[in-house]
Amino acid sequence: ENFFKEIERAGQRIRDAIISAAPAVETLAQAQKIIKGGD
């Protein structure tokens, strides 16, 4: 039972990291587009 709680906690941590990283990833993608000569 404890084992599953650990997995759940790790999963939440990973999800939080992805959620907080998403805006940065989007910003990087936009910056690359601009550098490559997009709009």
Swiss-Prot record:
Function: Cecropins have lytic and antibacterial activity against several Gram-positive and Gram-negative bacteria. Has antibacterial activity against the Gram-positive bacteria M.luteus (MIC=34.4 uM), L.monocytogenes (MIC=34.4 uM), and S.lutea (MIC=34.4 uM), and the Gram-negative bacterium E.coli D31 (MIC=8.6 uM). Lacks antibacterial activity against the Gram-positive bacterium B.circulans, and the Gram-negative bacteria E.coli ATCC 25922 and S.typhimurium.
Gene Ontology cellular component terms for the protein in this record: extracellular space
Keyword list, A-Z: Antibiotic, Antimicrobial, Fungicide, Immunity, Innate immunity, Secreted
Organism: Galleria mellonella
Expression induction: By bacterial infection.
Listed name of the protein: Cecropin-D-like peptide
Family: Belongs to the cecropin family.
Domain of life: Eukaryota
Main localization, broad class: secreted
GO terms, biological process: antibacterial humoral response; defense response to fungus; defense response to Gram-negative bacterium; defense response to Gram-positive bacterium; innate immune response; killing of cells of another organism
Tissue-wise expression: Hemolymph.
One Pfam family it belongs to: Cecropin
Signal sequence interval, chain numbering: none
Localization in the cell: Secreted
